[in-house]
């Protein structure tokens, strides 16, 4: 008789839990959220220590992520615009990926302040930064998927890619991707608001039960299942094609890149997904007690922060692995940064000019930079 009730309990465990993309310190508080008296012993579950740890750790971590991520993604945008001129579909996707990361990063200083204090920016700013956070988050995932498909077409279906991989098609798919990212973010924006609780203002989502369930399922599908399926399918085809390629150097270079993409992605996001899984099935797995809940709160803060640092790695993985791109970056610093720091070095600038003219041509430069992804 007990076994017959397992499936309904399992389904209920899936649909009765929701998780925010925000840190646990600003987790959603709705009618279905855990209260201090929800546990069997009737004793309150005080999470003061969890909040204190978050107040100490999250602000400096978010600040570092913001600084390194902002600088890295701005460099990607500058190089793509000034050197590459956005002449290929890969460039378009790289540009939009950097924009997604920047939208995501722009909210981090405010979440850093909120982790250490109350929310002081009002309801409108609460919705605005929530929207930027979600749009940047989903946009980043979607453009990683597009970049993966772009590499798949370029390597596995090279003839078809000559017609399909155009700048126009890249712009169209990018616009559609942004629209989808906005729609995916709407539930979080609509149901997020600033409230006053216990003499402090908070900013977080207040989902009705139905929308909470929908948001949880949609987020798991779009941010975990879909990208994993695309990566497995596309990179399996890419590896199969590359292992038949006679160009050993090109093959090994592409394999190293694919290996780096997959390893870094799983390294930064697998811990968060594991903690998210445990939290989702917390009641079903018999872990619904205060001690476990506090440990999961702490783990969620740490692993989600680790996942957010992935936006700092994107410029390295998707741009700077190309040798020509690194040379573009070196020349950019020599030509623009060093020019302001050392105006009395004519020999230095002649060397830079020679490198620019001899190393890069419109034909080879554009082709080699795209090899980075």
UniProtKB/Swiss-Prot annotation:
Residues exposed to the Extracellular side: 1-60, 113-128, 192-220, 278-301
Q: Name the gene.
A: Ccr2
Disulphide-bridged cysteine pairs: 126-203
Question: This protein's superkingdom?
Answer: Eukaryota
State the annotated membrane topology for this chain: Multi-pass membrane protein
| Name used for this protein in its record | C-C chemokine receptor type 2
Keyword entries, A-Z: Cell membrane, Disulfide bond, G-protein coupled receptor, Glycoprotein, Inflammatory response, Membrane, Phosphoprotein, Receptor, Transducer, Transmembrane, Transmembrane helix
Query: Where Phosphotyrosine occurs along the chain?
Result: 152
The species is Rattus norvegicus (Rat)
GO cellular component terms, A-Z: cytoplasm; dendrite; external side of plasma membrane; neuronal cell body; perikaryon; perinuclear region of cytoplasm; plasma membrane; primary dendrite
The UniProt entry lists the main location of this chain as membrane
GO annotation, biological process: blood vessel remodeling; calcium-mediated signaling; cell chemotaxis; cellular defense response; cellular homeostasis; chemokine-mediated signaling pathway; cytokine-mediated signaling pathway; G protein-coupled receptor signaling pathway
* Record localization: Cell membrane
Q: What does this protein do?
A: Key functional receptor for CCL2 but can also bind CCL7 and CCL12. Its binding with CCL2 on monocytes and macrophages mediates chemotaxis and migration induction through the activation of the PI3K cascade, the small G protein Rac and lamellipodium protrusion. Also acts as a receptor for the beta-defensin DEFB106A/DEFB106B. Regulates the expression of T-cell inflammatory cytokines and T-cell differentiation, promoting the differentiation of T-cells into T-helper 17 cells (Th17) during inflammation.
Is the keyword Transferase assigned to this protein? Answer: no
């Amino acid at each position: 008789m007990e076994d017959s009730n397992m499936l309904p309990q399992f389904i209920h465990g899936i649909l009765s839990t929701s998780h925010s993309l925000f840190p646990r310190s600003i987790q959603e508080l709705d009618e279905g959220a855990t209260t201090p008296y929800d546990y069997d012993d009737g004793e309150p579950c005080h999470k003061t220590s969890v909040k204190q740890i978050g107040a100490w750790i999250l602000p400096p971590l978010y600040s570092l992520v913001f600084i390194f991520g902002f600088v890295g993604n701005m460099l990607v945008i500058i190089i793509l615009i000034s050197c590459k001129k956005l002449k290929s579909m890969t460039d378009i996707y790289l540009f939009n990926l950097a924009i997604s990361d920047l939208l995501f990063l722009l909210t981090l200083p405010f979440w850093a302040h909120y982790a250490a204090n109350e929310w002081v920016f009002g309801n409108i700013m609460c919705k605005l930064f929530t929207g930027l956070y979600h749009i940047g988050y989903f946009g980043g995932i979607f453009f990683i998927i597009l970049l993966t498909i772009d590499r798949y077409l370029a390597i596995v279906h090279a003839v078809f890619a000559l017609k399909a991989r155009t700048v126009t098609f890249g712009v169209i798919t990018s616009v559609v991707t942004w629209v989808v990212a906005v729609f995916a973010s709407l539930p979080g924006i609509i149901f997020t608001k600033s409230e006053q609780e216990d003499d402090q203002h908070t900013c977080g989502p207040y989902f009705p039960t139905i929308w909470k369930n929908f948001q949880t399922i949609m987020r798991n599908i779009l941010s975990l299942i879909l990208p994993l399926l695309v990566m497995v399918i596309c990179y399996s085809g890419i590896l199969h094609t590359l292992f038949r390629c006679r160009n050993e150097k090109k093959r090994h270079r592409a394999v190293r890149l694919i290996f780096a993409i997959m390893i870094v992605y799983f390294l930064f996001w697998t811990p968060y997904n594991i903690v998210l899984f445990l939290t989702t099935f917390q009641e079903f797995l018999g872990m619904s007690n205060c001690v476990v809940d506090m440990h999961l709160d702490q783990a969620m803060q740490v692993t989600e922060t680790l996942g957010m640092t992935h936006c700092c790695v994107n410029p390295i993985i998707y741009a700077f692995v190309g040798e020509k791109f690194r040379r573009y970056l070196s020349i950019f610093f020599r030509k623009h940064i060093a020019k302001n720091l050392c105006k009395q070095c004519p020999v230095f600038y002649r060397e830079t000019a020679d490198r620019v003219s001899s190393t890069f041509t419109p034909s080879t430069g554009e082709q080699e930079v795209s090899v980075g992804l």
